[in-house]
Every structure is written in C-alpha cells, then in structure tokens.
Amino acid sequence: PVCQFSNQRKAHALRNVTLKLTEEVKMSSIAAPFGLNPIGRFDAGSLEVFRQYPIKSGESTAIVKGDIVQLVNASNATTIAKMTGTMDGSATDLCGIFMGCRFTDPNTNQLTFSQHFPASTVASDAMAYVVDDPNVLFTIQADGAFSNARDIYGKNAPVVQGTANTTLGISRVSLDAS
C-alpha cells in the first residue's frame, strides 16, 4: 500500500517541518564549532568534488575533517598541511577543506581510511581528500553573535583556529564574529 496525503495534509506537514527547522536555527547558540562542512553548490554539480593531495610524512600538526588546508612547498614535493593562520588577508596558498585521508598506519602496517591524520605520523603514502572546488558552499559556526546580522552576507571574515577534536576527527575552526 502507498501512503497518500491530501494537499492540506502536505501543507500541514511542510509547515511543521519549517517550524522545526526555524526553531533549531534559533536555538543554535551552543559553542561547538565543527570546521567547514560542504552543504551545496553554486551550480548544479555533484558534492563529490574532492581531490587527493599528498600529506607530508611526519607532519607535526594533526589534520581533521573540516580543517582548512594549505599547500606547502618542500624541496622535493608539494604537500598539504593544516592552515594555522586566520585567513585575514595574509599570503597563504589555500588549498581547500580536509574531508579525510588514507595512509599506512606505522603501528599496524595496515592501510587506514580516516577523518583524522594524527600529528607526527610517518607514512610515505599519506593522501588527503580535499574539497577544492570554488563552487562548493560550506557551513561554519561563528564564535559569537554578530553585531549587525543584516550586514554579514557576501563578506569575507577571518577564522578562529580551535584545537581539533582528534577523538571524533572533527575540526574546531569557527568564523570570527568580531
């Protein structure tokens, strides 16, 4: 049997969903930054738009899902690393947003797929999955309330680099609201 709703019931169901979504948005004052997460695109393309970039073996900083990564030129290769700045206009070779990685775990010698690349991991085959498409839209939590909420659209803003949650493999990058 197929469940069918009248137009009136559909409208009521949609109104309830809209109200619930609105209530959730209004209640989002919990300070729990999660980095940048892809939510859509400017065009009609797919959200499966990540590329692979090598991660430097022995990278001193952990990289987790939602972190902003930059290109790093080494003497023999170009790799990525977690961006440590605030993106306030300083010269940085921004690459994209880290979504996960694969590497051979030096402790188990097993190929590992993870949202988290541990700090100081020595793995010559480490590859990051990075969303680097300029048409992707992201969501990010701000670190506070904006003084003029109507004046935030279409603007650039610096970010705040929080300490990554390496247990869950989630970034703590947030948007600087000041």
Question: Which residues does each PLM region occupy?
Answer:
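Surface-exposed, low-hydrophobicity beta-strand/loop segments enriched in small/polar/acidic residues
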Residues: 23-178
